[in-house]
């Protein structure tokens, strides 16, 4: 543990004093925070260990400890996996959690059933429930008050994405629930803050799944919020930087914004001091790698009971780290998976949208569950006949949108059987087809053939035109095969055929140039 502490301390950010120390009656607070864990079971097991360590360190310093989640703990329609997510909130002893859009990958009623018995407070100020209330409404609160060991009280508010309805597969899943738009959310936030202040609260924290740019706007428009534990846009916000995640409310008081990336790869520890007026007078924001910690044994045993012990399929000797923003770079796991699909399903090319990849696998023993955790959406695969012009258009469209959007969406197309080069402004300058014998052929990116056809495999999200990829929609005559499985099954079968131990590395098939 001493070695671990030395590593963590060495990676700590410099603390920033915001107000001069005029008195000694300051409240020390440490916030353990996470966001967008996306059902990553292996990461949850490590995050429980991280949460326990953070609590012990806070107690040593005499700090209050809060554990807060900004949403998207769940993902996909697998109820058992999402039940593990609910158990994670419970075992890690989260004080409160916001709901994200992926909590609604399942119906509101199922979500309510999974959350109903938790001690964790579920916050959703800008959700509107129909008159025939679903059970989720009985769990969700607009705000709550928690008391630290010091006796100090904290007001907590939670908000969901204002565009929630556009983030779900089917409207029926919401069972009549709607979310307020951004302007109404900001208006109601001010009203909710005012209510808490009337109750004597002067330390107010927002748990938000609105995304960084909206969260920054909230910080600058709503008076009385001290900290925003953010999520949804998957930003990795390290340290404290004025103008970025240290901004000022309309009355000129500091507001701290946090986010810890995505998929449970990182978590944050926000160390604060509040003065007697409830202003943040000292701040230190440490974003840490979850892999510093071993899986928590209790959580691991519970997972095995809930999901069953997962079969071992291989031994991973070495692996390239996934990019901090895997939407704008080649992903080593995407290389392995797309190559697996191309080999096992005998296609010329494979295309996978970057957002499909949720997490990675650590070195050592690899189980089926490790691979399944990467693909939570259960999007079945299709083999299709596609023209050169259509897949070139898809690659170019993704690149242009991704490199010119604030949130890097929809993400570059991950591929097998192809190599391509894209500029930082989103222009695709070169595409090369690489056949199964390794022979390369350059494609005219400015005039691709409409009459030359390839066999391609991609999933039902893309075949339905997801991410506005209408050029990838196929008529029945061009669908060569429908597979009753997603990418995880193919990848698991492929890994079993590899010489062990195996490695996962990028090979430069996607190049980014100035």
Feature annotation, model-predicted:
Residues 17-18, 387:
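Short amphipathic alpha-helical "recognition" segments used for binding
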């Amino acid at each position: 543990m001493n070695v671990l502490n030395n590593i963590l301390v060495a990676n700590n950010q410099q603390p920033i004093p915001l107000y001069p120390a005029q008195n000694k009656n300051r409240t020390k607070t440490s916030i353990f925070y996470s966001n967008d864990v996306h059902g990553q079971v292996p990461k949850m097991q490590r995050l429980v260990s991280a949460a326990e360590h953070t609590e012990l360190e806070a107690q040593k310093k005499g700090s209050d400890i809060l554990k807060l989640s900004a949403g998207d703990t769940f993902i996909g329609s697998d109820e058992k996996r999402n039940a593990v997510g609910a158990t994670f909130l419970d075992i890690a002893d989260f004080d409160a959690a916001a709901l994200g859009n992926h909590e609604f990958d399942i119906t509101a009623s199922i979500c309510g059933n999974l959350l109903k018995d938790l001690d964790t407070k579920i916050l959703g100020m800008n959700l509107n429930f129909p008159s025939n209330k679903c059970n989720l409404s009985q769990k969700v609160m607009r705000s709550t008050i928690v008391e630290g060991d010091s006796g100090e009280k904290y007001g907590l508010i939670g908000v969901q994405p204002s565009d929630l309805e556009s983030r779900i597969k089917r409207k029926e899943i919401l069972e009549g629930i709607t979310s307020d738009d951004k302007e109404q959310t900001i208006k109601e936030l001010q009203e909710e803050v005012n209510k808490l202040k009337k109750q004597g609260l002067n330390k107010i924290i927002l748990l938000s799944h609105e995304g960084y740019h909206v969260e920054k706007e909230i910080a600058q428009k709503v008076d009385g919020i001290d900290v925003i534990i953010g999520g949804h846009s998957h930003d990795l916000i390290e340290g404290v930087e004025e103008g970025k995640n240290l901004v000022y409310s309309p009355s000129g008081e500091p507001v701290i914004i946090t986010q810890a990336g995505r998929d449970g790869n990182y978590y944050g520890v926000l160390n604060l001091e509040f003065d007697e007026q409830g202003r943040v007078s000292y701040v230190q924001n440490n974003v840490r790698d979850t892999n510093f910690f071993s899986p928590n044994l209790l959580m691991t045993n519970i997972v095995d009971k809930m999901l069953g012990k997962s079969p071992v399929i291989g031994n991973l000797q070495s692996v390239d780290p996934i990019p901090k923003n895997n939407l704008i770079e080649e992903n080593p796991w995407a290389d392995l998976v797309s190559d697996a699909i191309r080999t096992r399903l005998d296609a010329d090319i494979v295309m996978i949208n970057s957002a499909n990849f949720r997490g990675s696998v650590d070195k050592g023993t690899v189980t089926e569950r490790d691979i399944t955790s990467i693909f939570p959406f259960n999007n079945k695969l299709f083999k299709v006949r596609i023209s050169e012009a259509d897949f070139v258009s898809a690659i170019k469209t993704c690149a242009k949108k991704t490199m010119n959007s604030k949130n890097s969406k929809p993400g570059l197309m991950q591929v097998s059987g192809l190599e391509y080069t894209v500029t930082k402004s989103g222009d695709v300058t070169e595409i090369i087809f690489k056949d199964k014998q390794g022979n390369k052929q350059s494609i005219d990116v400015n005039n691709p053939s409409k009459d030359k056809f390839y066999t391609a495999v991609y999933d039902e999200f893309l075949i339905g035109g997801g991410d506005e990829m209408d050029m990838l929609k196929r008529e029945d005559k061009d669908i060569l095969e429908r597979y009753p499985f997603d990418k995880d099954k193919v990848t698991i079968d492929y890994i079993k055929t590899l010489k062990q131990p195996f490695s996962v590395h990028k090979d430069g098939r996607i190049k980014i140039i100035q």
